[in-house]
Amino acid sequence: MINVPTNNFNAIIVNDTSDYPEWVRGHGAHRIATHLRENGYSVLVIDFSSALNIHIWEEILKVSIGPDTRFVGFSSSWWPYRNKTGNQLPIPSNGSHDPEEVRRVRAMFGNNGQNTLTESAFLGKAKPWVDLVKKYNSKTKILLGGVKIDWYADFPADHFMAGYGEVQILDFLQQPKRIWNTLINHDSSAESKNWGWVESFTSYTKYDQIRSDELMTLEIARGCRFSCLFCAWPLIGKKDIAKYVKESKSLYTELLDNYTKWGITDYWIADDTFNDSTEKLKCVAEVVKLLPFKPKFRCYIRIDLIVTHPEQAQLLLDIGVNTVFVGIETFHPKSAKVIGKGMDSEKRKQALYHVQKIWGDQVRVQGGYIIGLPHEAYADICKSHAWFMQPDCPVHDIFYFPLIITPPELYPNKPTSELERSYEKYGYVITKENMHIGQWTKNDDSDITSFIQSNAIAKALNTNIQNKIKLSTVNNFRRHYSETNIIKDPTTEYFPNLLTMLKRDAEIVKVNTV
């Protein structure tokens, strides 16, 4: 036995962020950490794995791992999409780091040519990082969680954890003698026990080094009332609002705590559809009235709900929403009906004009449009694009996305949409040779016949939009990141401070060297 200075955390979770420089901390790691702390476990979250080199990694482990460290977990959610066993396939990133972005970030943070943790995982070279964990405690388990575990099946983990983790991770820690399968997925929806979702909130510690201008993630509801054909979110079709929406008290506590401790006022609401319930919006509006500050929110909404519930437009403004992303998807009547958004396109457009009158310059409206849906031809898309480009169009930013179909048989732990489970029914074909994300063909009454074609159209339209940027007085939330109080370079601003605090807080622990 030897004496070692360490914090001896029960768990360590390694996390990444969305694209730099306008990053958002991965929320899931901090949600799980909060849940475990509430149940008596000590947890360290390490953010910014895209900027973490292996030398700093070992320095952190030296003062963090001890005899009581049960697991070191890695979140795959913001790692790049890749082939299951390597980086052979160029795959649309959908907001996560693509391979070039990973390398650019490494260069920007000046890691002297060393692979960062995220890049090592992407290249299938994570073993040295895991070996260092085992060096300091051979009994510590390695877990891989997050939404992309199927894309990182070669990661040297003892266990892979699928889906929402609150129930599964607590079971894992509380049942140490249980023989756990490599894949832990016995409650991937975190619904088998009443663990307190509606009373829950996510909190942060001094080690997280939160800055006041950060955009934080806020869960108000977990689930959605609707079941759109293309939607792969796991908890759709929820009807009982009392079971999937947080209580006012917990929402108030989280917002006030983050403001009091860190000065946080800006949030991205993670709800699948924020305005799926007017009752929910009224509840949030009442919470906001009680706060000693005015929060600002970005969220995803359905515009057809504002057609049937026009009072929602004012409610969203009262809450403090300053940016909405509207899932328009298509204006083609047959296509819209197939995917579950069959309201007449003119009614949806009029609703967008309606909210513009109420919101004025205070809310920026962004929209998403999917290329490759059933029945919609290129000419139909061009007609919609022409409307988006009109000077008085109430949609300030439109983003085109190719339809991506992920075959369930290839990625069994990824939540799948109805379209992905029965794509043949809708005229899509995926051959064995092309059985990876996105490689479909189709033969229907449209002239868009493949993913490759839909991707090319989306890229061309997005480029066209960039060449004609809409300059307006409408709220633009994008300050240049140099003007914001956020961590801009984790290698100089985050990791040195983290190490200093960990070394200062370390206590002498007896460690068995055998």
Segments (PLM) and residue ranges:
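Radical SAM enzyme core and accessory elements
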Residues: M1-I13, R37-E38, S42, S64-R70, ...
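Acidic, low-complexity intrinsically disordered segments
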Residues: M1-L256, K261-W262
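Flexible glycine/acidic-rich beta-alpha junction loops that bind and position SAM and/or redox cofactors
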Residues: Y20, W78-G86, K148-A153, E279, ...
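A structural motif corresponding to the C-terminal end of an alpha-helix
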Residues: N39-Y41, W129-T140, K261-W262, L291, ...
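Short acidic/polar active-site loop segments enriched in Thr and Asp
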Residues: R70, I264-T265, N322, P394-H396
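Short, electropositive alpha-helical surface patch
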Residues: P156, G163, K282-K289, E376-V395
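Radical SAM [4Fe-4S] cluster-binding motif and immediate context
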Residues: G196-R364, I371, A386
